[in-house]
Amino acid sequence: MKLVKKILKNSCILISAIFFTNVNLVTVSQALEQSKAEELIKKISFEVNNIISSSRDEPVIIGELEFVFKKYADTNIMALTTLGPARRIASATQLEFFKESFQIYFLNKYARRFRELKDGEISILTSRPIRSGVEVKTRVHLIDWAPLEVLWLVSDRSGEVKIFNIIIDGINLLSSERVEIGVMLENRNGDIDLLSASLRDID
């Protein structure tokens, strides 16, 4: 458990899940295929490792990681989930501003930690259909870390197949972020606009 807490503090594993996913389009009536989810996890994992292992300048690498994140993570679903009940009283304009701010917040918080994932490996164990999409169970191997069991939750609710959550040794990414966002909102007396503005300034 100490290891997991340290990883959460360092923020290096959580964001990796955002990139181990896929973007194939599917129809509403077409079930998300487990094999496709698994193959695309391997594909995107390889892509990200190529980025972080390159000799390019740090700003270039961060920019490339941000681009991948925007493509493969369902930030709209993630943002609304982390906002919690407050989303029901927010206007459409407020929600759009929050979703944009949440994406910036996530990029600033996690993308630059990808250097710590260099030479890491992911092993796919199993996958299974779940109510909201597909759950892919993996084991993540990193240098100087004990292996971790990581679950990636993939959905096509947005019209594209994207990652929307990750669970690391029982610790739920969205639940953790929801608590943190909730505290930030409470500290701002429930002011969603102020929360959104603040998210853009967090490194």
Predicted regions and their residues:
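Early exported N-terminus immediately downstream of N-terminal targeting peptides
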Residues: 33-110
